[in-house]
């Protein structure tokens, strides 16, 4: 475990601007970007602004919101600047794949940390987003842990955007200052997935069939697709449900607040909503939302 002595001095010495941090990235390197709503937007924007200075840069990401349109840059630069490798198939754009602009590494999310940690897919750089450090130098990956912890532990160079808007989330989400090479302080709103205000007829019909199959006491894994979200909305008459999933949505939290989700009959991690996936091989990541 890293020592917390003098961590503040180390933190200040490692603080740089986004431009200076991205200048540490070299052509031909493999760069991991924090996943989903945990994407370090300020760092990604700085990366895109320097894209024409790179050659053969490979961007690795699990699930991206792509606010800086990295795919558009990959398309525009005809493969000379950067390529994007996705581990989550749902984030892929088929035209980009057809033109060899984007690549897919299909695998279970739970296997990805081992891929990084064993260096089967070595990462040269990890761009992540964290909360400010606590009194002992520990920072939280907050709302998006998934495979980011393994990426941060295995990358040759770790650059962290420190955002006061990132909440400290309990569980295996903490990274010490000593594990990070450079810090970029920048406050900005976190990304979010807007809820679908209206659902089409097909997802609603699918959900109506699924909800009849879900019994009281069932443990659920919830996706982000329309049918899954419609199913969650139809579970208000179910009791003692459990959650063991990659994502935590507003509708899931509404069920928890109403008492439909108790996690008492899961058989594993009782009383806990289990969110995300292993951050290292054979070690579950837990976020205890219930007492």
Language-model regions, residue ranges each:
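Single conserved hydrophobic/aromatic residue that forms the stacking wall/gate
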Residues: 273-277, 281-291
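Conserved alpha/beta enzyme-core scaffold
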Residues: 1-276
């Amino acid at each position: 475990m890293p020592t917390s002595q003098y961590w503040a001095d180390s933190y200040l010495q490692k603080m740089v601007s986004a431009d200076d941090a991205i200048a540490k990235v070299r052509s031909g390197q493999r760069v991991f970007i924090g996943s989903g709503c945990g994407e370090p937007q300020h760092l990604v924007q700085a990366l895109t602004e320097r894209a024409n200075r790179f050659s053969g840069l490979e961007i690795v990401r699990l699930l991206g919101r792509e606010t800086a349109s990295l795919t558009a840059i990959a398309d525009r630069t005809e493969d000379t600047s950067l390529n994007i490798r996705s581990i989550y198939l749902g984030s892929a754009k088929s035209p980009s794949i057809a033109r060899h602009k984007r690549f897919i590494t299909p695998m279970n999310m739970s296997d990805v940390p081992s891929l990084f940690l064993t260096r089967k897919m070595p990462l040269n750089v990890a761009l992540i987003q964290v909360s400010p450090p606590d009194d002992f130098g520990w920072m939280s990956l907050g709302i998006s842990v998934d495979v980011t912890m393994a990426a941060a532990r295995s990358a040759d160079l770790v650059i962290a955007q420190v955002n006061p808007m990132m909440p400290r989330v309990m569980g295996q989400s903490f990274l010490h200052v000593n594990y990070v090479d450079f810090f970029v302080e920048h406050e900005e709103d976190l990304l979010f997935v807007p809820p679908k205000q209206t659902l089409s007829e097909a997802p609603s019909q699918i959900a109506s069939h699924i909800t009849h199959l879900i019994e009281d006491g069932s443990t659920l894994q919830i996706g982000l697709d329309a049918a899954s979200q419609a199913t969650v909305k139809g579970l208000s008459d179910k009791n003692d449900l459990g959650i063991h999933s990659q994502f935590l949505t507003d509708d899931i939290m509404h069920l928890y607040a109403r008492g439909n989700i108790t996690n008492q009959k899961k058989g594993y991690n009782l009383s806990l909503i289990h969110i995300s996936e292993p951050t290292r091989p054979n070690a579950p990541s837990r976020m205890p939302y219930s007492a």
